[in-house]
Swiss-Prot record:
Domain statement: Possesses 2 putative nuclear-localization domains, a M9 motif found only in isoform B (sqdS) and a M9-like motif found in all isoforms described. These may mediate interaction with Tnpo/Transportin and Transportin-dependent nuclear localization.
Originating species: Drosophila melanogaster
Gene Ontology cellular-component terms listed: catalytic step 2 spliceosome; chromatin; cytoplasm; nucleoplasm; nucleus; omega speckle; polytene chromosome puff; precatalytic spliceosome
Subunit note: Interacts with bru1/Bruno; the interaction is direct but weak, and may play a role in regulation of grk mRNA localization and translation.
InterPro entries in the record: Nucleotide-bd_a/b_plait_sf, RBD_domain_sf, RRM_dom
Name this protein carries in UniProt: RNA-binding protein squid
GO molecular function: mRNA 3'-UTR binding; RNA binding
Composition skew (Polar residues), residue ranges: 36-49
SUPFAM superfamilies, per database record: RNA-binding domain, RBD
Keyword RNA-binding in annotation: yes
Entry function: Component of ribonucleosomes. Could be needed to organize a concentration gradient of a dorsalizing morphogen (Dm) originating in the germinal vesicle. At least one of the isoforms is essential in somatic tissues. Interacts with grk mRNA (via 3' UTR) and involved in its localization to the dorsal anterior region of the oocyte during dorsal-ventral axis determination; may function as a ribonuclear protein complex together with otu and Hrb27C. Required for polytene chromosome dispersal in nurse cells during oogenesis; nuclear isoforms play a greater role in this than cytoplasmic isoforms.
Pfam family, one: RRM_1
Length: 344
């Protein structure tokens, strides 16, 4: 019996939580949104709506570049009714990246796929795994000292399972700052919460916003000679062991939630960049990154190709001379020194 594994719905800087949906707007392979969006039954759509997409989503890695949506549907359709399929392609070349996402109409199909000994498509063994839901994070502003930590947790706990609560502390004033971050186990919880941007806790009105990562142009600043280096380097540039590890900006501040969040002092929270993500999303899928120059199956390995600047400098930067990672480390100054704060 095959091992029932789960993998994050994020790969090498991209979020795939929302691009496989019943109405199919996120498709990158042209006809996946139309052909794979429904299976012709409104009753099945209604039944599936009672279950989160994440619970019914399958990641399929190790695909041949020639594998089509139809071939995936023919193979996995025998395990259960398929709601949608999205074969991921490179946006520049249109070439398959060697993996896809499939959403079934029920969770039982995922169990059946996992229970099978092996899966062969186009004479090639593929690697299907249950996709794990992406966490969602909110920013809560306008908190007064009268609102206790426990009241905050209790209030937001009614909307979904809380994974983490971050409450920055003002050392000078010896009190909690007027904002916090709350992470839920599902992005859907955040989507639902944002329908009511103004909430009341203990009779006090607070602002609720989606916590967003630092803009890419700021994130990439470390590649142009940032003080502590943007890229961790190691051995792989992008993918592999090196990875793009910007959880800490090297200055001891949190990375990615700069910008202030409208007067709540969140700018003091620095550059908080949650979870070591690149563009907000982490490296999941046990090596199914496509940073290896789209060679082989388009996943696995480290560095090389379009997004992996060589083998990585020994103490930082992604390129051969610690140069920033892209295109063999030709950018100026990237990363040279190891970050002072290591990500956890």
């Amino acid at each position: 019996m095959a091992e029932n594994k789960q993998v994050d719905t994020e790969i090498n800087g991209e979020d795939f939580t929302k691009d496989v949906t019943a109405d199919g707007p996120g498709s990158e392979n042209g006809d996946a949104g139309a052909a794979g969006s429904t299976n012709g039954s409104s009753d099945n759509q209604s039944a599936a709506s009672g279950q989160r997409d994440d619970d019914r989503k399958l990641f399929v890695g190790g695909l041949s570049w020639e594998t089509t949506e139809k071939e995936l549907r023919d193979h996995f359709g025998k395990y259960g009714e398929i709601e949608s399929i999205n074969v991921k392609t490179d946006p520049q070349t249109g070439r398959s990246r060697g993996f896809a996402f499939i959403v079934f109409t029920n969770t039982e199909a995922i169990d059946k796929v996992s229970a099978a000994d092996e899966h062969i498509i186009n004479s090639k063994k593929v690697d299907p795994k249950k996709a794990k839901a992406r966490h969602g994070k909110i920013f809560v502003g306008g908190l007064t000292t009268e609102i206790s930590d426990e009241e905050i947790k209790t209030y937001f706990g009614q909307f979904g399972n809380i994974v983490e609560v971050e409450m920055p502390f003002d050392k000078q004033k010896s009190q909690r700052k007027g904002f916090c971050f709350i992470t839920f186990d599902s992005e859907q919880v955040v989507t639902d919460l944002l329908k009511t941007p103004k909430q009341k806790i203990a009779g006090k009105e607070v602002d609720v916003k989606r916590a967003t990562p630092k803009p890419e142009n700021q994130m990439m600043g470390g590649m142009r000679g940032g003080p502590r280096g943007g890229m961790r380097g190691g051995r792989g540039g992008y993918g592999g062991r090196g990875g793009y590890n910007n959880q800490w900006d090297g200055q001891g501040s949190y990375g990615g939630y700069g910008g202030g969040y409208g007067g709540y002092g969140a700018g003091g929270y620095g550059d908080y960049y949650a979870g070591g993500y690149y563009n907000g999303y982490d490296y999941g899928y046990d090596g199914y990154g496509y940073g290896g120059g789209f060679e082989g199956n388009g996943y696995g390995g480290g560095g090389g190709g379009n997004m992996g600047g060589g083998r990585g400098g020994p103490r930082g930067g992604g390129g051969p001379k610690g140069g920033g990672g892209f295109n063999g480390g030709k950018q100026r100054g990237g990363g040279g020194r190891q970050q002072r704060h290591q990500p956890y």
